[in-house]
Amino acid sequence: MSSVTTPAPVYTWTADEAIKFLKEWNFSLGIILLFITVILQFGYTSRSMFVYVIKMIILWLMWPLTIILTIFNCVYALNNVYLGFSIVFTIVAIIMWIVYFVNSIRLFIRTGSWWSFNPETNNLMCIDMKGRMYVRPIIEDYHTLTVTIIRGHLYMQGIKLGTGYSLSDLPAYVTVAKVSHLLTYKRGFLDKIGDTSGFAVYVKSKVGNYRLPSTQKGSGLDTALLRNNI
């Protein structure tokens, strides 16, 4: 005698249950969305580096969460049409995630900075101050870059980098590293304001496929930009 298997019951969400869920979780969801909105709105390197790092973490988590949700949609698709769209979205999300990692690794090889894995931009401005390389992200590669020193505090494009510097410490060149090439900016103007303050304007002068010069003494690489075929 063969046993008859009964199909598992399909649970459906009623409108009343949905309204009840929103009433119970509305306050928490509102606080979470408000927190994310404030972080995304005010997370800039020129304002607060701590808030900016939190913003980068949120943006970085968006990709794996998107992939998880699209895979979930594939497993629990409502019909074949939803399944087809879910498969396409999953493939696109995974490909873009892989491309992000490939570009970030290439940029890391070029600069050696963990800012290369910034999900917001692939532009890293770099300045060598007395053998110390400062690397920070910028949204785009501008035609000019401004470096300011205010009472020994070093700022580049409004982003504070360090202290204990003077105008005489400013290099002749700064760079903006991208995935496929390196932009070189030449100092075109320097003005001193008072005894310990001033600024310099750097103008884009050369574009090439290079990596950052080494700052290690004795390597023979301090004054040259090296060819990089990646």
Swiss-Prot record:
The residues on the Virion surface side of the membrane are 1-24, 77-84
Task: Pull one GO CC term from this UniProt entry.
Answer: viral envelope
An MF annotation (GO) of this entry: structural constituent of virion
The way this protein sits in the membrane is described as: Multi-pass membrane protein
Question: Which CDD domains has this protein been placed in?
Answer: HCoV-like_M (cd21568)
Mapped to this chain, the residue ranges on the Intravirion side of the membrane are: 46-55, 106-228
Q: Which domain of life is it from?
A: Viruses
InterPro entries, per the entry: M_CoV, M_HCoV-like
- Matching PROSITE patterns, A to Z? COV_M
Transmembrane segment boundaries: 25-45, 56-76, 85-105
Q: Where in the cell is it found?
A: Virion membrane; Host Golgi apparatus membrane
Provide the alphabetized UniProt keywords: Glycoprotein, Host Golgi apparatus, Host membrane, Host-virus interaction, Membrane, Transmembrane, Transmembrane helix, Viral envelope protein, Viral immunoevasion, Viral matrix protein, Virion
- Which family, according to the similarity comment? Belongs to the betacoronaviruses M protein family.
Tell me, what does this protein do in biology?
Component of the viral envelope that plays a central role in virus morphogenesis and assembly via its interactions with other viral proteins.
How does it associate, per the subunit comment?
Homomultimer. Interacts with envelope E protein in the budding compartment of the host cell, which is located between endoplasmic reticulum and the Golgi complex. Forms a complex with HE and S proteins. Interacts with nucleocapsid N protein. This interaction probably participates in RNA packaging into the virus.
This protein's name: Membrane protein
Task: Report the gene name.
Answer: M
